[in-house]
């Protein structure tokens, strides 16, 4: 059991027990601290500066040691604003890395990078804490079986399946349903896998973090009446925070997720929004520490930092962490070092399409642009693979024919092409699905569709068995039986109108 430095003994007793240094230099969020000879703190140790500024306001700044400079000095990066600090102030070496609360007490709460609650709901139980710096699981602990992580979302499970313990890149602009998809995944992992989720908001807008929290409360993902029944813990280090906080908030979220995997032996979903901001913060810190920049001004340690984070996200024999990472691509340049380094770690990509969202097809996952390394016959089986390939071929042919249809109309197509278009439109609509978390907005009950049901449904559409049914019957339904029932209802309604 470890004690969190941010919530430990009173200041006086800390000073008696701990190593004391003094601030020698302040350059923005970077502090140089001098310690007595032979009492240098280790790399990654937490340092705490306490005192009062010139206006009498209390100061409590936590820093992390990054470099040992010689002459009994260390260079540390602050995790909060350094206003009010001055040379000569006392600095306490906590003797260990930053530690954050873990376990069930974190569910339904919002934390900052230090593991302090920022939601005004009172203190958190800090009896169980864990350091944010750890090594990745040893090779012998890893679960090397390739298994699909079933989400209950048809378009994902069929065309770009997630790997259990894998990493998925989520690409999408504003307003195409990224938040709703994230919340549905959080909901489904809790119901189908008995798992929990951790959301790491890394360097994104505070407004978006607040909106997500409000929507989670509205949709029941966070249970205000009984926080222990919530399905997610939130960790935020937003745009306005110093680079140190933005660089470490991903590790704080990951540490909370690791506890659920290793101690509670659960399947965990870890969301990182946005992984690019993690790299960006590392770049800022690197420059402040005086390192020579690498390509495009990024830090020379880019691959190492990314690898250290990503290698901890994996399946072990006890449980799994499956990570979904929103990826911002600067200037849409996929060769930029930040997204290029991220791609090397991804097992699947889920691309959200504005065109599909405009058509009202939700989730607006692009079936042709989304990819997965799991979609191989030896992993998913011949039936799944063949069905997915046929669906993609049909949709691709429809995409090719759209220009001809726009100019000449459907009637100018061959009989075979018209049949392909009709089936593709049914497939496109059948890829939509009502979500549990959207029930409060749409009034339609959410649907969880198992993988076997999904494959059966698309095989029947491709076989031509439902060529006679109207395409509206396939829109926003769960499995194929609901589509046939909806078609019967539509037929009865049209007869009554006549």
From Swiss-Prot:
Question: Which residues bind ATP per the record?
Answer: 172-179
Q: Which is one Pfam family of this protein?
A: ATP-synt_VA_C
Q: What is the lineage of its organism?
A: Eukaryota, Viridiplantae, Streptophyta, Embryophyta, Tracheophyta
Q: Which domain of life is it from?
A: Eukaryota
Catalysed reaction(s) here are: ATP + H2O + 4 H(+)(in) = ADP + phosphate + 5 H(+)(out)
* Keyword Repeat among UniProt keywords: no
Write down the InterPro entries for this protein, in alphabetical order: AAA+_ATPase, ATP-synt_VA_C, ATP_synth_F1_bsu, ATPase_a/bsu_AS, ATPase_alpha/beta_chains, ATPase_F1/V1/A1_a/bsu_N, ATPase_F1/V1/A1_a/bsu_N_sf, ATPase_F1/V1/A1_a/bsu_nucl-bd
Give the sites modified to Phosphothreonine.
6
> What task does this protein carry out?
Produces ATP from ADP in the presence of a proton gradient across the membrane. The catalytic sites are hosted primarily by the beta subunits.
* UniProt KW Transport keyword: yes
For membrane topology, the record states: Peripheral membrane protein
**Protein's name in the database:** ATP synthase subunit beta, chloroplastic
Q: What is its main location?
A: plastid
- The broad enzyme category this protein falls into is translocase
- UniProt GO MF annotations: ATP binding; ATP hydrolysis activity; proton-transporting ATP synthase activity, rotational mechanism
Q: To which protein family does this belong? A: Belongs to the ATPase alpha/beta chains family.
Quaternary structure note: F-type ATPases have 2 components, CF(1) - the catalytic core - and CF(0) - the membrane proton channel. CF(1) has five subunits: alpha(3), beta(3), gamma(1), delta(1), epsilon(1). CF(0) has four main subunits: a(1), b(1), b'(1) and c(9-12).
Q: Which GO terms describe its biological process?
A: proton motive force-driven mitochondrial ATP synthesis
Record keywords: ATP synthesis, ATP-binding, CF(1), Chloroplast, Hydrogen ion transport, Ion transport, Membrane, Nucleotide-binding, Phosphoprotein, Plastid, Thylakoid, Translocase, Transport
Gene3D superfamilies, per the entry: 2.40.10.170, Bovine Mitochondrial F1-atpase, Atp Synthase Beta Chain, Chain D, domain 3, P-loop containing nucleotide triphosphate hydrolases
One CC-aspect GO term: mitochondrion
